[in-house]
Amino acid sequence: MTVFDSIVSRTPVDKGWSGDRKYKAFCADGSCYFLRISPMSKFEKLKRQFSHMQQVQALGIRLCAPVEFGVCGEGVYTLLQWVDGRDAEGVLPTLDKKAQYAYGLEAGRMLRTIHSLPSPVPTEPWSLRYDRKLDAKIAAYRACPI
């Protein structure tokens, strides 16, 4: 039985800009996970992403640990370890400059370690991928009602 199959309830997570459906998923044994359900068209991309997360975890980087990846009736799913806490977006401004700087240094060290992994072979030029990502973010920003 997969972890996905042992989920007994879900609570929607309404954060982020992706169109994926996100949930805090609960299992009968009391464990909980971050569940992301995406369209099947994203299968290959998300499979690579899950593999990269496993590689990053193997480096000792703290992240929501990748637990399971698969296909369900709703699309392709990714299950990550749930980490309780608060969003840095709300917490960082309440910290003094020294603490903010310390977190920035730690994040930089983590990124340096992540960048030690070999880069995947791109299927298209970086500039095209980046422009497409920016265009999507700009469109989402413009559509945001705030």
What are these regions (language model features)?
Residues 1-6:
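Juxta-kinase regulatory segment immediately upstream of eukaryotic protein kinase catalytic domains
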Residues 12-128:
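ATP-binding pocket architecture of kinase catalytic cores
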